[in-house]
Amino acid sequence: MTNSSNNSNKCENKNYYEILKVSIDADIEEIKKSYRKLALLYHPDKLNKEENIEENINNFSNCLVNNNNNNNNSNTKDFNDIQIAWETLKDDLLRKQYDSLLLEQKRQKYSVSDEIDLDDMEFIEENSEYVYPCRCGDHYIITEDQLSEGSDVVCCSGCSLSIKVIYQME
């Protein structure tokens, strides 16, 4: 059990989509392509030894001061995060469960400042998204895909406010 909690702690500041550098609505091919690229960059067996030597020399004084020589551990940690993210997002069921978890975390993290009816939001057909102005001058944006996945809490892109979008599934 300790191992699984360690895995979740590794990725605690970034979600799996951020780790794989894809959007939350990315398709499996896009996710796979990004995973492969990142795996090649961070896999411990694929790392360029000369780059590691040069990096270790550059970080030598920091290691002495901090008594912390975990450069390789950082690369291994990055690769492990990438692997965990891929294993979750490549499986449809695990991805849906993970997306639900992200949504629940988002709801708990952000207190809802207002409830807005979807009909009051402007629909931007080009991006298939709904937009609503925030009092800070920026906007709340939610896509049709997010709505169909059950997402209803939207954070402003410019401040810490969030709204709950009221709508009925058709």
Swiss-Prot record:
SMART domains tied to this protein: DnaJ
Domain DPH-type MB: residue ranges: 112-168
GO biological process: protein histidyl modification to diphthamide
Keywords linked to the UniProt accession: Iron, Metal-binding, Zinc
SUPFAM superfamilies for this protein: Chaperone J-domain, CSL zinc finger
One Pfam family matching this protein: DnaJ
Iron keyword on record: yes
Occurrences of domain J (ranges): 15-102
Binding-site residues, Zn(2+): 134, 136, 156, 159
Protein family per UniProt: Belongs to the DPH4 family.
Domain remarks: The DPH-type metal-binding (MB) domain can bind either zinc or iron ions.
The protein, known as: DPH4 homolog
The species this protein was found in: Dictyostelium discoideum
Upper taxonomic lineage: Eukaryota, Amoebozoa, Evosea, Eumycetozoa, Dictyostelia
